[in-house]
Curated annotation (Swiss-Prot):
Protein's UniProt keywords contain Amino-acid biosynthesis: no
Intrachain disulfide bonds: 64-70
Propeptide section residues: 23-46
Listed GO CC annotations: extracellular region
Source species taxonomy: Eukaryota, Metazoa, Chordata, Craniata, Vertebrata
First and last residue of the signal peptide: 1-22
Source organism: Amolops loloensis (Lolokou Sucker Frog)
Localization of this protein: Secreted
Keyword check for Metal-binding: no
InterPro entries cross-referenced by the UniProt entry: Antimicrobial_frog_1, Frog_antimicrobial_propeptide
Protein purpose: Antimicrobial peptide with activity against a variety of Gram-negative and Gram-positive bacteria and against fungi. Shows strong hemolytic activity against human erythrocytes.
Family assignment from sequence similarity: Belongs to the frog skin active peptide (FSAP) family. Brevinin subfamily.
A Gene Ontology BP annotation from the UniProt entry: defense response to fungus
Protein name: Brevinins-ALa
Pfam families hit by this protein: Antimicrobial_1, FSAP_sig_propep
Length: 70
């Protein structure tokens, strides 16, 4: 009977550790997903002003060539 209790206690202990490790991995995965979303927002913020700047430089030249009023 004592050996049965000992093995059940060991299984319970190992199961608890296993669940704890799984929870830590799950939390780490969720944090990585959040970081990716934040990085996408930062890339969009950097990309749009650059695109607007290029358009501001390119559109007057294009308009000038199309209308031939340079």
């Amino acid at each position: 009977m004592f050996t049965l209790k000992k093995s059940m206690l060991l299984l319970f202990f190992l199961g608890t550790i296993n669940l704890s490790l799984c929870e830590q991995e799950r939390n780490a995965d969720e944090e990585e997903r959040r970081d990716d979303d934040e990085m996408d927002v930062e890339v969009e913020k950097r990309f749009l002003p650059m695109l607007a700047g290029l358009a501001a430089n390119f559109l007057p030249k294009l308009f000038c060539k199309i209308t031939k009023k340079c």
